[in-house]
Amino acid sequence: MSEQYPVLSGAEPFYAENGPVGVLLVHGFTGTPHSMRPLAEAYAKAGYTVCLPRLKGHGTHYEDMERTTFHDWVASVEEGYGWLKQRCQTIFVTGLSMGGTLTLYLAEHHPDICGIVPINAAVDIPAIAAGMTGGGELPRYLDSIGSDLKNPDVKELAYEKTPTASLLQLARLMAQTKAKLDRIVCPALIFVSDEDHVVPPGNADIIFQGISSTEKEIVRLRNSYHVATLDYDQPMIIERSLEFFAKHAG
């Protein structure tokens, strides 16, 4: 799938080559690397080799996204993982929202991943399933899900429309990921916002109970909505994830 539109300013991927420990960061559905950039820069500053790709069909125009499948998004993440594998002995993966879903998906297929940090990750959004099976013809595009932030001074760089076809792809990705959670054995630090208007917070419990990891923890974010990586709890997410990397990097 070739994209027809230019990349939006601020939606560019981010790479930093540093030490032998790498971190792959994955942004969310309809979003861009912008939502994960503060974390990527903090990890790079701490000496980690960092890869923050732009998912296929994202960060350009929602018509580009409409032409992609979840396999394209997986391929974008696999490519980033491969880039890190060439440079690093140890790799962690973190992601926001669908980026968290892709984090879980990757851990299901790559048991050598050292640890994962899903942030408001999605494996079950009943509203999507209800919308798809509710009967009647759905519009081609729905309103944006972006910028669910408690901080009124911050805006997420994301599409103003959501392609209905892409929601179906997200539903398929979530279903496949949820079905194989028990394959995950690496340490997991699971962040969840108490108030999230996009992904029900109960997803964190589904993930926690579903994965086979012996080392796993849920950290509740009291002062952020869905896009927690840009919200009030951002410093805490950075601090706790850096502690997690240091602990498990050996």
Swiss-Prot record:
Q: Which residues form the active site?
A: 97 (nucleophile), 196 (charge relay system), 226 (charge relay system)
Xref: Pfam families: Hydrolase_4 (PF12146)
Please tell me whether the keyword Magnesium is annotated for this protein: no
One of the entry's Gene Ontology molecular-function terms is:
monoacylglycerol lipase activity
Q: Binding of substrate: at which residues?
A: 29, 98
What are the temperature characteristics of this protein's activity? Answer: Optimum temperature is 75 degrees Celsius.
E.C. number: 3.1.1.23
Q: What is the effect of changing residue 145 to G?
A: 18% reduction in hydrolase activity for both 1-lauroylglycerol (1-LG) and 1-oleoylglycerol (1-OG)
- The enzyme's first-digit EC class, named in words, is hydrolase
Could you list this entry's UniProt keywords, alphabetically sorted.
Hydrolase, Serine esterase
Q: Which reaction does it catalyse?
A: Hydrolyzes glycerol monoesters of long-chain fatty acids
Q: Where is this site: Important for substrate specificity?
A: 145
pH dependence of activity: Optimum pH is 6-8.
Query: Which superkingdom does the taxonomy of this entry point to?
Result: Bacteria
Q: Which Gene3D superfamilies match?
A: alpha/beta hydrolase
Q: Give the regulation of activity.
A: Not inhibited by cholate, but slightly inhibited by triton X-100 and deoxycholate. Completely inhibited by PMSF (phenylmethylsulfonyl fluoride) at a concentration of 200 uM.
Q: Which family does it belong to?
A: Belongs to the lipase/esterase LIP3/BchO family.
Q: What does this protein do?
A: Hydrolyzes monoacylglycerols, with the highest activity occurring with 1-monolauroylglycerol.
Q: What PANTHER family does this protein map onto?
A: PHOSPHOLIPASE-RELATED (PTHR11614)
**Anything else the record notes?**
This lipase is not secreted extracellularly as other bacterial lipases.
Assembly information from the UniProt record: Monomer.
Q: What is this protein called?
A: Thermostable monoacylglycerol lipase
Provide the species name: Bacillus sp. (strain H-257)
